[in-house]
């Protein structure tokens, strides 16, 4: 059985499949990306074989920032009697993500990417597939009864899959975060992010020392470097001026094969960011005469 992913996936959507390849002998294959580092329907079609059982992709990648055509990809894998699994960590907080419209079989996303607490996440699955899932751990709360004769009766979904004491405080915090985002409106959040992204790219492109690795990003994610400067040093420099960016490989260690660089600085725009903050970033990047004084 084959599982299709890409080299732009987060570790959370790579390592579990690689472990299953070792344990039970599945075959992990990579869908090639095009010259813009994006997934195309043509490349998906060419990657599917009679042995393909799963396509597992991020809806929005956390480095390239592209929005995948999940609805069309889902149609292709279902025609092959396979499953569509989606990493929604970068889509659910930022844009409308419709599991029914896109015919997604499983969708996973986390609270801390959408103003919620850490240690909490969501797994959506079609009920017919959840019914067949084996719990990954066992304990109190998941069973209706168990007897000395070793008979066990488990509860119905979702309790059957949730043993022990849940992260109650985390779940309640996540609920409030969702309510807050819904009050603002996911469409309004997405519109705001795209406006900021376009504004940011226009400004960054005017700085000759800046190299942008995803100029065609379709989300609020922009990755860049100051030429000939380590990403971590750029991050330290910006931090001196109270500007926070992420520096490193962003848990996508294979994407270097696509963009040609191991570490980058990543800007992840969200509902709380402003054009004034972008202006401050641009000002610091343009007037970087003190860069070496700060990082050395």
Residue ranges and their predicted role:
Residues 1-296:
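Pyridoxal 5′-phosphate
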């Amino acid at each position: 059985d084959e599982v299709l992913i890409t080299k732009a996936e987060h570790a959370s959507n790579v390592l579990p499949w690689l472990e299953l390849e070792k344990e039970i002998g599945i075959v992990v294959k990579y869908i090639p990306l095009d010259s813009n580092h994006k997934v195309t329907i043509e490349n998906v079609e060419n990657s599917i074989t009679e042995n393909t059982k799963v396509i597992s992709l991020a809806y929005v990648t956390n480095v390239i920032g592209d929005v995948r055509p999940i609805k069309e990809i889902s149609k292709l894998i279902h025609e092959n009697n396979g499953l569509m699994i989606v990493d929604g960590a970068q889509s659910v907080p930022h844009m409308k993500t419709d599991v029914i419209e896109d015919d997604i079989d499983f969708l996973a996303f986390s609270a801390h990417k959408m103003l919620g607490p850490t240690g909490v996440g969501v797994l959506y699955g079609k009920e017919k597939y959840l019914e067949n899932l084996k719990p990954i751990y066992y304990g109190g709360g998941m069973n209706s009864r168990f007897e000395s004769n070793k008979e066990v009766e488990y509860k119905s979904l979702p309790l059957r899959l949730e043993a022990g004491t849940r992260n109650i405080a985390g779940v309640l915090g996540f609920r409030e975060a969702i309510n807050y985002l819904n009050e603002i409106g996911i469409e309004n959040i997405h519109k705001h992010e795209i406006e900021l992204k376009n504004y940011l790219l226009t400004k960054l492109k005017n700085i000759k020392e800046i190299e942008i690795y995803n100029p065609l990003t379709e989300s609020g994610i922009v990755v860049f470097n100051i030429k000939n400067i380590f990403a971590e040093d750029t991050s330290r420099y910006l931090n001196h001026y109270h500007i926070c960016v992420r520096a490193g490989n962003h848990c996508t260690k294979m994407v270097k094969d696509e963009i040609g660089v191991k570490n980058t600085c990543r800007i992840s725009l969200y509902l709380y960011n402003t054009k004034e903050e972008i202006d401050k970033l641009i000002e610091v990047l343009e007037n970087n005469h003190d860069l070496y004084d700060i990082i050395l």
